[in-house]
């Protein structure tokens, strides 16, 4: 698997703004994209149906999602500011990658991306 994730700056701004608006609750969105030679390229952000946003958690019923092989991962927020995935994050992640954004949601410095094993990947914002 690639160790690099490529994300347009507009998409990162959208994820950060959504997290900021829901703060102090956690936000969650799906990441659509594709695996390419140079890395995993995220092309779109989707709001999962029937998502729940709470203090210390966010979730959605996976069985309510249509079959979509373009989902490469999930992005969610940590209102605490921590950018490290919890055991729960790793166990409940969907797809190949997990993007975590943390308070104060100001920019790339408040975002980290991981694979399903919790290993840090390179986040390239273009």
Predicted regions, residues:
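Conserved beta-strand-loop surface patch within small alpha/beta domains used
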Residues: 1-71, 79-126
């Amino acid at each position: 698997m690639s160790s690099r994730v490529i994300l347009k700056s507009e998409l990162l701004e959208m994820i950060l703004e959504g997290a900021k608006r829901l703060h102090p609750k956690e936000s969650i969105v799906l990441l659509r994209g594709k695996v390419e030679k140079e890395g995993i390229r995220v092309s779109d952000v989707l709001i999962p149906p029937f998502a729940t946003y709470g203090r210390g958690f966010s979730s959605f019923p996976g069985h309510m999602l249509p079959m979509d092989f373009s989902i490469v991962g999930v992005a969610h927020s940590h209102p605490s500011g921590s950018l490290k995935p919890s055991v729960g994050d790793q166990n409940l992640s969907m797809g190949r990658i997990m993007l975590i954004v943390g308070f104060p949601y100001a920019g790339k410095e408040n975002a980290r991306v991981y694979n399903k094993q919790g290993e840090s990947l390179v986040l390239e914002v273009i």
